Amino acid sequence: MRTSKLMTLSVLVATGLGLAACSGDTGPAGANGATGATGATGATGATGATGATGPAGQLPQQAEQCTVCHGAGRLAGAAEIHNLRASADLTSGLIQITGVTFPDGTVTPTVNFTVWGPDCGTPGTAAPSSPTDTCKPVDFPAVNSQPLPAFNFTVAKLAPAPSAGSNPFWVPYLYGNTTPVAERSCGSGIVTSTGLPDCSPTTSSTTGTQIVGTLTRPGGVGNYSYLFKTNLAAVTRPGTTTPSIYDPTLTTRFGIQTGNDQLFANGTLDVVPPAVAVGGPGAPTTTTPIVATQACNQCHQRLAIHGRRVLEAYCVTCHAPALVEGGQSGNMVVMIHSWHAGRQLDLNYSFAGVVATEITYPQDVANCTTCHQAPGSSTPLNAWQDNPSFTACFSCHVGGNVGAAAGGPHQGGTVTAASNCKVCHNSTTPLTPKADVKVAHNSADSIFATATAKNFQYQIVTVTNTAPGQKPTVKLQVLFSPNGGTTAFAPMQVVGATGGPWSFNTPGGASRLFVDIGWQNTDFRNVGDAVAVGQPISLDVLNTGVANTTDFSVVVTSTTAVPAGLTGQLTVAIEGHPGVPNPLSSASPTTAVRIPVKNVTKAAAVSGTSTTARRAVVDVAKCNRCHEDLSLHGNNRTPEPPSVSLPFGSVAVCAMCHNTEATDVSRRPAAGGIDGKSQETIDFKAMIHAIHSAQVVIYGFGGSVNDFRDVTFPGYPANCQGCHISPDPDDFPVVFTYAQPPVASFGTTTSVGADLVGNTDNLRTTKWASVCLSCHASTSLFNTTTDPARAARNIDHASTNGAGFGLTQAQIDALNK
């Protein structure tokens, strides 16, 4: 019983203590419990606003630092120092002769004219009817505060043809001894260190006095008047006392040339003078030219002969039949024909120190319309075919260059300057079909081939299986129209054709058709195609193609797969030529001539799906200004012409083979070439520059030797826009289209290593140096420079600024970090 009471008391005490704790301070927090299970993922929240664009990432550093000085807008920007104005030192303007007046009783005419410039057009362009913001009359030359400049003034009459077999010709009125000369004005304030007028006046053969007339400014910006000193009616024939040669009934041409280097401009005006006793203004008249200045400048870019003579119409006022030096005629027709044909026809002609056989002409000399045309004009210049003359014809056709194919005398017998060539050589009743002058010249195989090529078109229908590891398959068609498209083009049979243009397909025959495949489009290298020296895959269409007899399409499949790991795009090209007999040619009336059909290319995706044609770098139309219809390697490779999709055409078919990996090592003799070298790069950018600057030998198919060391470039080598894409005819500033890419730059191979298929042991020149030094210093790339000291300085300059020579691509990549 006692025990029970004690237990009860203990419980009560404990309970009482517990009840008392509820009113005490809060105790410390207990430890966290275990983490519960992860709840379900909540719904995705709304997309936040686009953040600000971050700074551009840093591009890989290029070892070559050319753009530091030669970039756009820099101290020596490439665009600013490589253009027509800089290279030719020409600021071209126009001279507009507004009228010529003659005093009564004497013939000392006054010429009124306006100087326009400097941005009023190229030589031969007519002055605008009214000034504009960019083209207006100028006080010449305003830049050095010389108020009255020096001008040269010529005057000549157009004499009638002396016989039925000749043409009208110009007769100069002004002579110094026996040579045609110009009068010259001496501007006020223009003096030499001796205090004498700086105009070097000539001496009249008639009066024995200096020919310096009077130049005045009647008022108005750019307006001038010149009073001739010579009385044209008192002029005698050179070297004789024959009475006056002046004839006011004949067309008379007045010409003006600027007399210093502030502005290069010529101007002419043809008038019929009034009777001597009457006087008054000359009546303007029009004379159809034989050649247009614009035609000359298509190839020469900007002719400036004797310093400042830029207009063909001005040239003929001196280069007339009367001009003879050293027994050689300086007559325009003789001189120009002989110079342009000299190398091809081996003519023994030299005038003014220019030897005809030292001039290389970049197309067939029989293509008369290259010069005898007026680009952009609807006026045909057909005197060459409608009025053939002894003088014109025999300036080319001398010795064995006339007559039968094997050479020989003129088949029509002896001819003289009085002979009437048109009796046999006309277009209506020619002695034979080929006696028609136009037909005769167009019968040359090269000209026939160019004309016939317009009847064919290549078409790439599809390109499939272009992913890495696959073997590309190409479907193509050849289209034909018998008249260049007047009748619609339609597919023609190619494989298995007999008796037609594709049947001459024996080895070395006139018919050849291939598909080439190269990669990648950014820079063709063709790495991994198992073809020697970086060459593309080539597929023989005529002998391996599978033909569809319904639509005449052909399918060819590569035997080589696209390399593993390749990305980007590849390019497919169709190249080759049909064979067509030339019925007009005595050399090949039945033998087929190779026809240079325009090649076509098509890009195909290796990775991804997008395709883009290879970048345009040069303008094919500019190539053809000189080369007429550029086609190489036996008329197989003919660059694509400009079109809607390719506004500048394309030389991709050239660059596929002529790439950074390639040299001519496989074509050269083992002992070396005629230049003493074992190989030469054929990288397009370096090779083309070197060819046009006359400093390279290239070995081609079959070991053929192409020695370009005597090429005479007809323009200005430093005028990059002569070939490259540029925005307008004056091309300033120039748009350079080979931009430095933001990836590793592939150097130009100058020496292929022992592995002729692989490229890791190729020795190279870095990219910028390879292209710049192909002109500026040839020692490292083309060892034929005539100025080794200058070449060494330029190479040292390039090396100092990051260029490398004799490096592998791995070494170049290591530099470009």
Q: Language model features by range: what are they?
A:
Residues 107-382, 467-769, 774-780:
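Extended surface/linker regions that mediate inter-domain or inter-protein docking
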Residues 64, 73, 369-372, 394, ...:
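Membrane-embedded alpha-helical bundles of multi-pass integral membrane proteins
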Residues 21-63, 71-77:
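Collagen/collagen-like triple-helix recognition
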Residues 34, 80-93, 312-318, 332-338, ...:
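Short cysteine/histidine-rich metal-coordination sites, predominantly Zn2+-binding motifs
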Residues 1-20:
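Sec-dependent bacterial lipoprotein signal peptides
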Residues 60-88, 415-452:
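A eukaryote-biased signal for short, well-structured alpha-helical docking elements
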Residues 83-104, 443-469:
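Low-complexity, acidic Ser/Thr/Pro/Gly-rich terminal tails and inter-domain linkers that flank the onset
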Residues 399-431, 471, 477, 481-484, ...:
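Repeat-solenoid scaffold signature
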